Amino acid sequence: LFSGCAASLSDANVKGEKAVTENISLADSMNLTQPSDGSSDAAQMKIISSANGIIASSILGNEKGCYEVFDRPANGGNLLYTDYATKSHIYLSNQINSDHNNESDTSYLESTIGGCYLALSDDYLFIFKLNTPSFAADETSERQGYIARCDLDGADRQILTKLAANESIVSGCVACDGENLYYLSCLLQDDGTTTPSTLIQLKIADGTRREICQLDSESRHFIVGAHQDKIILKSILNPAKLSDDLSADDIVRAVQEQVHQLTLLSSDGQQQELCRWKQDERSEMFMNGNMYYWDKETNGLYCWDLESDTPECLFAGPIRFDDEVSYDRLSLSADSFDGHLLATAVQDSDGQAVSCAFDPISKSLQKLTLTSDDEKSVLILAEGSEYFLVGMA
C-alpha cells in the first residue's frame, strides 16, 4: 500500500493520503527526461542505489516518482512505477491494456530468481539481476545474472553485461560518475570460499567491463558513499570468524572487536585511508559526502567533513522527546530524507527504542510519529520534490 505525504520531516506527523491506482498509459503519466549529451559534473561520483546497498534496492525513486520490482508468483516479475504528479501506481509499460507477462511489454522481467534490484541515475534505470545459488549447475537464461540499462520510461532496455556463473555482486552500494557504474564483485569457488572483492567499472554506453583493482583478501569491503570524484569504501579489517563452538558472549565480543576502516577509492584504484574505529565505538552513516556518527564514548553525534578532515560535534544533550523518557544513545540508519538523518534512540536498561530524525542544520532531534488514518505506523520508502512515498507497516 502506497501513500503520499508532504516531503518535509518537520511536517511528517500528518496523516497519509492514499494513492490512486489507475490503468493509464505510461506516456501520459510520466514526464521523464531522456539522456542528455554531456554533463558538467560527469566526473562527480554519486551513489545511485539505496544507501543500504544494492540488495536493499528493490524500491528506488527520484524527485518525480519511484520504481519498484514486483515478483510474480510464477517466477517472472515486472517493473512498477509510482508517479507523484498523478498519484498513480502503474506498470512501467509501453502498453495500456496488457497482462504484462511477456517480453513485448517493457515492464516485464523474465526472472527475478536470485534477486532483482535497481539503481537510478539522472538518465537511466539500471537492473541488477543476480545469479541464483544453483546457477552453475543449471545454466538457464532465467537463472543467469546480468546488469541492464533502460530509459526512465522503461524503453530501450539493453543488457550491459552478464554475470559469470559463479559471480556475486558484493552487498554494498553502486556508484556512478555519469559515464560508468562502479560496484564490487567476487567469485564463489568450489570449496565455498570467495575470491577477494574486485572493483568493477562498467561503461554505461556500451557495457565495456574493466577490473580496476582487487581489494585486501583478509577484509570485508563495502561501497558506502561518494565524495567528489571518489568512492567511500568501508572495510572490516578483522571480520569475526564464527563457529558452532563459540558461545553467545564470544560472538558478541568478536563482533565488537571488529576494526572498521574508511578509505577514499579513486576510479583508477588509488586508495587513501581516512580513519579507523572499533565496531563498538561508533554508529555511522554517510550523507552529502560527510560521515555522521554517534560516538559511544562521548555520547555525542558528530559530522566529519571529509573535505576539511575535521569532526564537529552536532549534538551532545540528553536524548528526550515529549514523553520525557531519557534515552542513552542513537543508532544511525543508512537512510536520510529531507536532509535529515534517520536514527533510533535506544534505552539500554530495558531496550526501549523510538524512531527519530536529526536535522544537521538546526541541530535538532525529533521523534517520528508518522501514522496512517487507521493509526498504523508507516515507513518512508522514497522522497520526491513534494511528497514522501511511504508503506504501511
Tell me the role of every PLM-derived stretch.
Residues 121, 130-134, 142-143:
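Active-site-adjacent structural elements in enzyme catalytic domains
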Residues 62, 86, 121-123, 153, ...:
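Acidic/polar residues in short coil/turn loops that connect beta-strands
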Residues 2-4:
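C-terminal motif of bacterial Sec signal peptides marking the signal peptidase cleavage site
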Residues 6-11, 16-51, 74-105, 136-165, ...:
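Surface-exposed loop/turn elements that mediate protein-protein interactions on large endomembrane-trafficking
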Residues 67-71, 126-129, 182-185, 232-235, ...:
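Residue position within the beta-strands of beta-propeller blades
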Residues 70, 100-103, 108, 129:
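Solvent-exposed, non-transmembrane segments of extracytoplasmic/periplasmic domains
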Residues 50-62, 102-120, 166-178, 217-228, ...:
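Repeated scaffold domains used in trafficking and secretory/extracellular systems
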Residues 329-354:
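Loop/turn-rich, solvent-exposed surfaces of beta-rich toroidal or solenoidal domains
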